[in-house]
Amino acid sequence: TLRSRGLGDVYKRQDHLVSLKKLIENAKTITLHSDRLKNEISTLTDLQKIDVFRKSDLIEIQKKNLPFGNLNFTELSEFSHIYRSPGPIYDLDGYGNNWWRFARALNAAGFNNKDIVQNCFSYHFTPAGMMFDEAAKILKCTIFPAGGENSDMQAEIMSEINTTGYVGIPDFLKIIIEKAENNDLPISNLKKALFSGGPLFPDVAEYFKSKNINFYQCYGTADLGLIAYEADINDGMIVDEDIILEIVKPGTNERVPNGEVGEVIVTVLNNYELPIIRFATGDLSTIIEGQSKTGRTNIRIKGWMGRADQTTKVRGMFVQPSQIAKIVDNLFTNKPKAKLIVSRENNRDNLKLLIEYVSNENDKIALNEKVVDEMKKILNLNGIVEFVNLGSLPNDGKVIDDLRDFGD
């Protein structure tokens, strides 16, 4: 069902245990998983016997055996789509109904068969666009596959087709609304939104309230699909019923007590074709005690609370320290120290790459253009470059310094 069933304690559900055992049996036939799955799993608590599988592990495994590192249980012909996400990581999906499970999030946000949905997630390379397209189809919504570019045209289309619902990152909707207002385009039919892929800053949330837009957030990844979703504002996020979610001490297998902040670890139970067991998201969150006031009885988490490592999300894209190193290595033979500064001004995320480099101004101008191009190529994001004196960057181990204020 789209509405969560009665679930009880997260580590005691018997139907989860049955699904987990089936998932593990499939995964044991895959060589790279078999070593992780030697211990017998008789309870959900026994999951801690299985080592956490990290995104960095997945990148290296796939690199050695493209495209999926031989981690798929079934042949590629049985899958529907292949995607390539930053990392790079290859993802895929199957033909099963609600494969990514985002229909639950849309349903909780009030979307239905009366809605015209402007889907502003990308439809190319990465799975986000298809994730929400699939979800909206299940709810019988009418979908405009907009993607995440050209805000002027987005505003025009939103007015002409009488869009009632938006899915995408929060900042982009604000830009579209402002474009519509500046061009006297009526968009009064827009009443609801479901956000993911980027933080909802307090000032932006207040802006949407002032426009009488009912908005909700959901939390998911390209590797895992839906992890959790809001069913009511300020009530945390309901964990999707087809996953097992654990909160552990970052970098370990050890669970933390409910209420303590730690790293989100996910096992996906409904997709046997590509077994995902104890996958470390690199995200921080915490389990909220008690039941949701909406009546949904699955456990809740506070939502996305930052990164367990220095990886950060900017304009819907993950940026990793290894990518910063690659930019520098591709252009500099002496591998100077570099630090990426992520800031926010005028409701927009900004990137500035600081590089310790001494040369004449003409060399710096030419090199600046090359670095900007390399940032766009590797990060899929625009940014600026600033060359600084040797030894001026602090010796704090930070490659990415996120200065944005995420609020409480």
Regions found by a protein language model. Give the residues of each.
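Conserved AMP-binding loop of ANL adenylate-forming enzymes
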Residues: 107-143
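Active-site glycine/GP-rich loop and adjacent strand/helix microenvironment
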Residues: 9-25, 139-408
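Short, composition-biased local secondary-structure segments
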Residues: 95-109, 125, 171-181
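Nucleotide 5′-phosphate-binding alpha/beta core
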Residues: 5, 9-108, 112-113, 252, ...
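Short secondary-structure boundary/capping elements
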Residues: 77, 97-101, 124-128, 146-150
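Acidic/glycine-enriched edge-of-secondary-structure segments
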Residues: 84-97, 133-142, 163-167
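Hydrophobic/aromatic beta-strand patches that form the interior of the parallel beta-sheet core
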Residues: 48, 54, 117-118, 144, ...
